[in-house]
């Protein structure tokens, strides 16, 4: 489902003639096949708009935080910015904190930041910064392991236990596919911690844009987390 939006991002890099229309950004190239691919990708994305939000697709039944964030990150704001804004807010709790699966929900911060970069909507950014800040504070309390200097929880996108081996996978629960039904609460994953690193950087950029100064705390935490990632995963 996110392969389509990755295609959209790649098309932006192709030699093209972008222009705005009433329904968003359109692209034209000198290659008919690329134009056809663009049209197919846009139709596929639009097909998955349900109740004015971009759904995760197939039979998932609605939106998911990581899907919304990654779709925004991959460029869907170029042609459905209003839908993506509604989708981003739809996975929050009253626009105060990000909801849904806790371990990688911080990816919403990156999605919200990219939404701003593509729309330049400062009012959105002000609210998104508050929501992002509150969510990071929450996760620093419940998901941070100071002994490693890393955040806990499963890896990004792996919400099914088939992605993990024993002993994380509990062989006594073969019928339970949900990742949180197994021994995943205290593991530390590279992808998830990289998302936290990006979130700290995005928070710093949001603060800089809104306040015209660097947020020393977020910038420092990003660097510290990067060092801890390198030490724990690569040394």
Feature names for model-found ranges:
Residues 11-13:
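Hydrophobic core
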Residues 19-129, 133:
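Substrate-binding groove/exosite segments of carbohydrate-active enzymes
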Residues 38-41, 132, 218-233:
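Short amphipathic alpha-helical coiled-coil/interface segments
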Residues 48, 91-94, 115, 132-135, ...:
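Alpha-helical solenoid scaffolds that mediate protein-protein interactions
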Residues 95-106, 140-220:
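The feature captures the catalytic groove of carbohydrate-active enzymes
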Residues 137-148, 228-235:
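Secretory-pathway/luminal and periplasmic proteins that interact with or process carbohydrate-rich
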């Amino acid at each position: 489902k996110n392969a389509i939006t990755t295609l959209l991002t790649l098309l932006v890099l192709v030699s093209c003639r972008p222009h705005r229309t009433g329904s968003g950004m359109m692209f034209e190239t000198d290659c008919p096949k690329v134009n056809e691919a663009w049209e197919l990708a846009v139709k596929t994305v639009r097909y998955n708009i349900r109740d004015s939000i971009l759904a995760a697709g197939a039979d998932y039944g609605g939106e998911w935080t990581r899907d919304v964030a990654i779709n925004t990150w991959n460029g869907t704001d170029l042609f459905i910015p209003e839908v993506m804004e509604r989708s981003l807010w739809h996975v929050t709790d009253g626009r105060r904190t990000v909801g849904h699966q806790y371990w990688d929900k911080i990816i919403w911060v990156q999605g919200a930041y990219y939404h701003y970069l593509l729309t330049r909507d400062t009012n959105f950014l002000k609210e998104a910064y508050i929501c992002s800040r509150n969510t990071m504070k929450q996760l620093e309390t419940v998901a941070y392991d100071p002994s490693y200097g890393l955040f806990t929880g499963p890896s990004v996108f792996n919400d099914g236990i088939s992605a993990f081996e024993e002993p994380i996978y509990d062989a006594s629960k073969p019928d339970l596919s949900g990742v949180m039904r197994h021994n995943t609460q205290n593991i530390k994953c590279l992808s998830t911690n990289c998302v936290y690193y990006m979130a700290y950087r995005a928070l710093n950029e949001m603060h800089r844009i809104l306040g015209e100064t660097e947020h020393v705390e977020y910038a420092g935490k990003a660097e510290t987390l990067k060092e801890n990632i390198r030490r724990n995963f690569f040394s």
